[in-house]
């Protein structure tokens, strides 16, 4: 039995025992992540264990998709997959071997950094963070890949200050609809607090704008230090979006009434757009406010894309983007969301106050919790 299961897995992969696990740095519905080092070279890596539970026949299709995408994407601002390793099936693991994805190690994730009050980003450093994030999105979108889980915890930063988009467990290739036949992608993606309005309304023929909405949420979070819209349900999330971005109507979003959920849900009416008004207490730079405003546009067709965002005046006005290495060199401990102390959930930007909550563990968001 062990031999049969073992042959299904990864017969040409090295044993994961070539790495020594040092610490657990991530945990979620989809697996565990460990910091580790190569026993011979000392190279630091991150090991992402692929959950094989409930996989009665072969390798999980979601993991295969993630591996295929990561093998395609090679860019400075995308996490690098080094190799795939395994443990052999044996009686000691119920005849189920494990598969590990091996990545270059990154010292921090953005959620962990923002959770630490001692970490201070200057305007120049925020510009560099967003420049690298949008550069990564530009690259994956040019390669016809959607990330589909943009959030601060999935943005890694090395000790040298290089940002890497990570966790492609929900990513997929996309294409334009053909012969007037719309795509039928699942809309049950993206962590709730970062999920764009089109997905909340049931859209299944979507594209890169879903990732740009997440980029806008993350950009605002660079100042507020916590997620700006923390809904408990999909309807609550839509209400928070309406409070910040204005009511969802055909006037501001042509053909939005085509969605079946547009009539079924009790959408908030009479709300004016107040992105800049609500955020100006935190974000003092007018160019930053303007870019956030353009990223958090309700209608995905009017939302700014990564190319235009990179050309926005925010990145080309003083102070210019600056390196993160100096700031990070003053923090010797790795910072990850998983390792951050739990914080009490406070109020949100939509109620004009910040909060220090980082973990959506009490909401139905846990269904989409991701690691690495």
Swiss-Prot record:
Reactions the enzyme catalyzes: L-seryl-[protein] + ATP = O-phospho-L-seryl-[protein] + ADP + H(+); L-threonyl-[protein] + ATP = O-phospho-L-threonyl-[protein] + ADP + H(+); [DNA-directed RNA polymerase] + ATP = phospho-[DNA-directed RNA polymerase] + ADP + H(+)
EC number(s) on file: 2.7.11.22, 2.7.11.23
Activity regulation annotation text: Activation by Thr-186 phosphorylation is calcium Ca(2+) signaling pathway-dependent; actively inactivated by dephosphorylation mediated by PPP1CA, PPM1A and PPM1B. Reversibly repressed by acetylation at Lys-44 and Lys-48.
Modified residues (Phosphothreonine): 186, 350, 354, 362-363
Database matches in Gene3D superfamilies: Phosphorylase Kinase, domain 1 (3.30.200.20), Transferase(Phosphotransferase) domain 1 (1.10.510.10)
Highest taxon, organism lineage: Eukaryota
Organism expressing this protein natively: Rattus norvegicus
InterPro entries: CDK, Kinase-like_dom_sf, Prot_kinase_dom, Protein_kinase_ATP_BS, Ser/Thr_kinase_AS
One Gene Ontology term of the molecular function aspect: protein kinase binding
Residues the record lists as binding ATP: 25-33, 48, 104-106, 167
Modified residues (N6-acetyllysine): 44, 48
GO CC aspect terms: cyclin/CDK positive transcription elongation factor complex; cytoplasm; nucleus; P-TEFb complex; PML body; transcription elongation factor complex
Protein name (Swiss-Prot/TrEMBL): Cyclin-dependent kinase 9
PROSITE patterns: PROTEIN_KINASE_ATP (PS00107), PROTEIN_KINASE_DOM (PS50011), PROTEIN_KINASE_ST (PS00108)
Positions with biased composition (Polar residues): 347-366
Keyword Phosphoprotein attributed: yes
GO biological process, one term: positive regulation of transcription by RNA polymerase II
Region Disordered: start-end pairs: 343-372
Family, per entry: Belongs to the protein kinase superfamily. CMGC Ser/Thr protein kinase family. CDC2/CDKX subfamily.
Modifications the protein undergoes after translation, according to the UniProt entry: Autophosphorylation at Thr-186, Ser-347, Thr-350, Ser-353, Thr-354 and Ser-357 triggers kinase activity by promoting cyclin and substrate binding upon conformational changes. Thr-186 phosphorylation requires the calcium Ca(2+) signaling pathway, including CaMK1D and calmodulin. This inhibition is relieved by Thr-29 dephosphorylation. Phosphorylation at Ser-175 inhibits kinase activity. Can be phosphorylated on either Thr-362 or Thr-363 but not on both simultaneously.
Active-site residues per Swiss-Prot or TrEMBL entry: 149 (proton acceptor)
Stretch list, region T-loop: 166-191
Assembly mode: Component of the super elongation complex (SEC), at least composed of EAF1, EAF2, CDK9, MLLT3/AF9, AFF (AFF1 or AFF4), the P-TEFb complex and ELL (ELL, ELL2 or ELL3). Associates with CCNT1/cyclin-T1, CCNT2/cyclin-T2 (isoform A and isoform B) or CCNK/cyclin-K to form active P-TEFb. P-TEFb forms a complex with AFF4/AF5Q31 and is part of the super elongation complex (SEC). Component of a complex which is composed of at least 5 members: HTATSF1/Tat-SF1, P-TEFb complex, RNA pol II, SUPT5H, and NCL/nucleolin.
Chief location bin: nucleus
Sequence positions bearing Phosphoserine: 175, 347, 353, 357
């Amino acid at each position: 039995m062990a031999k049969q299961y073992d042959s299904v897995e990864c017969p040409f992969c090295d044993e994961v025992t070539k790495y020594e696990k040092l610490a657990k740095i991530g945990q979620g519905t989809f697996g565990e992540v460990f910091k580790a080092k190569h026993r011979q070279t000392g190279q630091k890596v991150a090991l992402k264990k692929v959950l094989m539970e409930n996989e009665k026949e072969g390798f999980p299709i979601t993991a295969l998709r993630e591996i295929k995408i990561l093998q395609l994407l090679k860019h400075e601002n995308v996490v690098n997959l080094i190799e795939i390793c395994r443990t052999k099936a044996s009686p000691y693991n119920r005849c189920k071997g494990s598969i590990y994805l091996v990545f270059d190690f990154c010292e921090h994730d953005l959620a962990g950094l923002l959770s630490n009050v001692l970490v201070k980003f200057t305007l120049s450093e925020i510009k560099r963070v967003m420049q690298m994030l949008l550069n990564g999105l530009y690259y994956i979108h040019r390669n016809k890949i959607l990330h589909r889980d943009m959030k601060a915890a999935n943005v890694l930063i090395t000790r040298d200050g290089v940002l890497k988009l990570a966790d492609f467990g929900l990513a997929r290739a996309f294409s334009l609809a053909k012969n007037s036949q719309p795509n039928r992608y699942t809309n049950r993606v993206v962590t709730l607090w970062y999920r764009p309005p089109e997905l909340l309304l049931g859209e299944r023929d979507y594209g890169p704008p879903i990732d740009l909405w997440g980029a806008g949420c993350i950009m605002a979070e660079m100042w507020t230090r916590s997620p700006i819209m923390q809904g408990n349900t999909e309807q609550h999330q839509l209400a928070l979006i309406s409070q910040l971005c204005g009511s969802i109507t055909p006037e501001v979003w042509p053909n939005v009434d085509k969605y079946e959920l547009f009539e079924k849900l009790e959408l908030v009416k009479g709300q004016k757009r107040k992105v800049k008004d609500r955020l100006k207490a935190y974000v003092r730079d007018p160019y930053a406010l303007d870019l956030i405003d353009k990223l958090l546009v309700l209608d995905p067709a009017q939302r700014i894309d990564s190319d235009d965002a990179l050309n926005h005046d925010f990145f080309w006005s003083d102070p210019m983007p600056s390196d993160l290495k100096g700031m990070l060199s003053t923090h010797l401990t790795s910072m990850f969301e998983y390792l951050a102390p739990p914080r009490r959930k406070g109020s949100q930007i939509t109620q004009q106050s910040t909060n220090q909550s980082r973990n959506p563990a009490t909401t139905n968001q846990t269904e989409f919790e991701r690691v690495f």
